[in-house]
Amino acid sequence: MQANRSQDDLVKTFKAILKEERFGSQSEIVLALQAEGYGNINQSKVSRMLSKFGAVRTRNAKQEMVYCLPAELGVPTAGSPLKNLVLDVDHNQSMIVVRTSPGAAQLIARLLDSIGKPEGILGTIAGDDTIFITPSNIHEIDKTLDTVKSLFNFND
């Protein structure tokens, strides 16, 4: 039980550090966490945490490149329907386009990428509110389109 609480404390501290928007490298984050008493933290652990929480590098108010957490627009949980974030799904002969609520495209794209080739998705490119999906096989794009639509309970 103590290990879980310690992990929860680490996550809270990690998020608080990123909210400061002043750490431009993973080694700076490691040093900050070590200063907070997490002596066993290392760069690979920080790298995994940055990836897990979707941290990105962006410019802060001083125009410095720093790590920060994406804006939490009611970050979906396992219980909240992602389908509410998908506004439109369309396609042509070679690509599927998904339109999302602002800020949701990267989250949805990550989900689609995790499904991958078995469901006909070769890869995705996500902006703020638009995702381009490249199907594994353009001759089966309708099947991939149906898969994407069914994932989000999207009906025309």
From Swiss-Prot:
Alphabetical list of Gene3D superfamilies matching this protein: 3.30.1360.40, Winged helix-like DNA-binding domain superfamily/Winged helix DNA-binding domain
A Pfam cross-reference name: Arg_repressor
Signal peptide: none
Pathway in which the depicted protein is active: Amino-acid biosynthesis; L-arginine biosynthesis [regulation]
Localization: Cytoplasm
GO molecular function, one term: DNA binding
Keyword annotations: Amino-acid biosynthesis, Arginine biosynthesis, Cytoplasm, DNA-binding, Repressor, Transcription, Transcription regulation
Any one Gene Ontology BP term: regulation of arginine biosynthetic process
Annotated InterPro entries: Arg_repress (IPR001669), Arg_repress_C (IPR020899), Arg_repress_C_sf (IPR036251), Arg_repress_DNA-bd (IPR020900), WH-like_DNA-bd_sf (IPR036388), WH_DNA-bd_sf (IPR036390)
Broad class of the protein's primary localization: cytoplasm
Protein name according to UniProt: Arginine repressor
